[in-house]
Regions:
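Short, well-formed alpha-helical segments that are part of the catalytic scaffolds
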Residues: 2, 6, 10-25
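Short aromatic/hydrophobic "clamp" motif used to bind/position activated sugar donors
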Residues: 59
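Donor nucleotide-sugar recognition loop
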Residues: 145-146, 155, 159-180, 187-198
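Conserved donor NDP-sugar-binding/catalytic core segment of glycosyltransferases
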Residues: 40, 67, 71-116
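Glycine-rich, basic loop-to-helix element that forms the pyrophosphate-binding segment
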Residues: 38-54
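Boundary detector for helix-to-coil junctions that initiate low-complexity/charged tails
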Residues: 230-293
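Active-site donor/metal-binding and catalytic loop motifs
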Residues: 160, 185-211, 215-219, 233, ...
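A recurrent flexible, glycine/aromatic-enriched loop bordering the glycosyltransferase active site
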Residues: 121-153
Length: 293
């Protein structure tokens, strides 16, 4: 049986999602909703609560803003875990290279996976594209870590791992941390290609997200860098590391600019030379280097 575990900002998940699961999973399952409407839990403690109540052989942790877009994915999932004895965890998108610095899984852009990305534009929800990273696709596709919108595990792994609500709080860093725990326990992390998920909202990394990356790096720095599922030369690693560094420099430059423009001194004309112009030029330069313009 598959246990589906959701941390919900409400007392339950939308009826439409329940119906979507029922119509597409194609396997025996139970649904465990951890009610976080009173903001009692971090994502770590909520998922630990879900593990306590789960009865399935496979545990799937999923966001509540997703839609399953293909049928019988649950049956395929059970078959996949039966076929590959070493796999402990699967996801739909992840990285082959995690550098020796605080970094998100997507920062180095050496990725595998697929998902549909949705967004609300001018008050109307629509699918804006399909993210598909196939360059490193093999069967099986090994990765260092996966994205947290959908992750499935063998139940018995939770005798060796747990959602680390001691080192972390809040709602960030949980996916990469648990991925590294799986590798450190002697099991593998794979991309599961036989489910297509539509993610109905795009992530928006803020300061608390980047702080969680610092905690993550301090915890796992002795294992980094880590490469799985492909080979990467030292020169390529250095180049990808620089990409990750530039992404972080860009965020902190934008963060400083936002704080500056919101400051009382700036609004009252305390800065005659308008340092925001300097930050703007810096951000523009970084975006150009990263190919974001």
């Amino acid at each position: 049986m598959i246990s589906l575990i959701v941390c919900s900002r409400n007392s339950t998940i939308p009826i439409s999602l329940k119906k979507n699961i029922e119509e597409t999973i194609g396997a025996n399952y139970e649904l465990i909703v951890v009610d976080n409407s009173q903001k009692k839990y971090s994502i770590f403690s909520a998922y630990n609560e879900g593990v306590k109540h789960a009865k399935g052989d496979l545990l799937c942790f999923m966001h509540e803003d997703i839609i399953y877009r293909n049928n019988n994915w649950g049956e395929s999932l059970e078959s996949y875990f039966m076929q590959y004895n070493k796999v402990g965890m699967v996801g739909v998108a992840g990285t082959h290279y995690l550098p020796a610095m605080p970094a998100a899984w997507w920062d180095t852009e050496i990725r595998s996976g697929q998902l549909l990305q949705g967004s609300v534009i001018n008050g109307e929800y629509k699918v804006i594209g399909k993210d598909e990273w196939l360059e490193y696709k093999h069967i099986p596709t090994l990765v260092v870590s996966v994205d947290g919108l959908w992750m499935c595990f063998r139940r018995r792994l939770f005798d060796l791992i747990r959602w680390d609500d001691i080192s972390f709080n809040g709602f960030h860093g949980y996916d990469t941390d648990i991925s590294l725990q799986v590798w450190n326990s002697g099991y593998e992390v794979h991309i599961f290609w036989d489910v297509l998920i539509e993610h109905m909202s795009a992530g928006n990394a803020q300061l608390d997200f980047y702080k969680s990356l610092d905690v993550l790096y301090n915890k796992w720095c002795n294992l980094l860098p880590m490469i799985k599922g492909t080979e990467i030369s030292e020169g390529e690693q250095t180049a990808r590391l620089r990409i990750a560094e530039l992404r972080h420099e860009l965020f902190y430059s934008e963060y400083k600019l936002r704080n500056l423009c919101a400051s009382r001194q700036y609004r009252w004309g305390g800065y005659l030379l308008k340092p925001s112009t300097i930050y703007y030029r810096m951000i523009k330069h970084l975006k150009r280097l990263l190919g974001l313009t």
